[in-house]
Swiss-Prot record:
Native source species: Nostoc sp. (strain PCC 7120 / SAG 25.82 / UTEX 2576)
Name of the featured protein: Photosystem I 4.8 kDa protein
Family of this protein: Belongs to the PsaX family.
Subcellular location: Cellular thylakoid membrane
Lineage of producing organism: Bacteria, Bacillati, Cyanobacteriota, Cyanophyceae, Nostocales
Quaternary organization: The cyanobacterial PSI reaction center is composed of one copy each of PsaA,B,C,D,E,F,I,J,K,L,M and X, and forms dimeric and tetrameric complexes.
Entry GO CC: photosystem I; plasma membrane-derived thylakoid membrane
Record's keyword terms, sorted: Membrane, Photosynthesis, Photosystem I, Thylakoid, Transmembrane, Transmembrane helix
Gene Ontology biological-process annotations: photosynthesis
Membrane topology (UniProt): Single-pass membrane protein
Transmembrane segments: 23-43
């Protein structure tokens, strides 16, 4: 029996929006550093 290729993600051939996910990653990283700076009393 041949196995059918079943994927939960639609195979449309479109490129993933790397700019979108990179923007969110950089935003979350910036917020993370802001919280860390506040925690270590670098900013008041």
């Amino acid at each position: 029996m041949a196995k059918a290729k079943i994927s939960p993600v639609a195979n449309t051939g479109a490129k993933p929006p790397y700019t979108f996910r990179t923007g969110w990653a950089l935003l979350l990283l910036a917020v993370n550093f802001l919280v860390a700076a506040y925690y270590f009393h670098i900013i008041q």
